[in-house]
């Protein structure tokens, strides 16, 4: 482990490998490239301190370097102990980002590193799962006067932050980047859909076609996972608690069951709910021999590991990132990536082209917080529609796509109430 006052990484000599990774993904992130060019010229974050808790891999690295190029002092820690890529973190440290993260860090190190990142006394926080905001509110209240606001990347994080708002404990404004159209319609659906299966297939090297895939949760992430499972030839079963989403899943052509019924027939189970213990003891007891369990939600609580451990008579690791739990009756259940985010713990996360839009939003959210400091209440906000549309237009242009424009006649018609039947 290489540590100084400005970084703590596994091995700083890994930096050249990380630099190559960052350079590769940057070529497929035209929206963030566009914003970076603008930021480099204007330096909107000169003198601004930004602390981030993110999955520290190549796409997030390009975001952090974009903010640094904009003049910010940037610090960062991991948002998940297993998603860190050590070579990328080394490259960030070499580039002058104050970064503290090591793949496989334990819980104590996780929070120690987060506190180190917070020692920069941030004006802006970029969060992924709301752990950094929560830590500030509970343990680092002395930082609050310096904080103008924070942005949140994930559905899980936004749920936590809205709960904080409801309880009246928020002390600064939050921008829910996750709730922007160019985030959840693309990142959550197409990004999660592809990267979750990338993680599962890389880890298991098993066939998906012909299997029963149980998707627990039919939000935008669940929709993407189910869509790609069908494309791979699986029979897809959706488990939901929301009657409207359950009905939508059925109308989309998927089977819908409760968890007890799905547990009996599933070959691969994937959770994407943001809630706790969605698959637990009574479900494990019904599963087939060889059932595979994976999680696509932010925290490792959706599949009950304590229940698996209590039921198992033997625990082993047949392959990297796979834990085998042997039951008393001889059945074997396989948990991928310790129940953590399978797409990041067992693969490289979302495709660069998808994160291009999400991280463009994060960069603009940071600028929005700076420009509106002192004018926003301690509430959860969504970015203005014009920022969403700006990101979409730049993305379309990078794809060589030109869209139609309303004529003046059409605009006038849409604004009028006088024309009827």
From Swiss-Prot:
Classification via HAMAP family: AdoHcyase
Role description: May play a key role in the regulation of the intracellular concentration of adenosylhomocysteine.
The record's free-text note on cofactor binding: Binds 1 NAD(+) per subunit.
Record-given protein name: Adenosylhomocysteinase
Primary location class: cytoplasm
Any single Gene Ontology cellular-component annotation: cytosol
Subcellular location: Cytoplasm
InterPro entries cross-referenced by the UniProt entry: Adenosylhomocyst_ase-like_sf (IPR042172), Adenosylhomocysteinase-like (IPR000043), Ado_hCys_hydrolase_NAD-bd (IPR015878), NAD(P)-bd_dom_sf (IPR036291), S-Ado-L-homoCys_hydrolase_CS (IPR020082)
Domain of life: Archaea
Gene Ontology biological process terms, A to Z: L-homocysteine biosynthetic process; one-carbon metabolic process; S-adenosylmethionine cycle
GO molecular function, one term: adenosylhomocysteinase activity
Pfam family of the protein (one): AdoHcyase
Sequence positions that bind substrate: 128, 153, 183, 187
Cofactors named for this entry: NAD(+)
Catalytic activity: S-adenosyl-L-homocysteine + H2O = L-homocysteine + adenosine
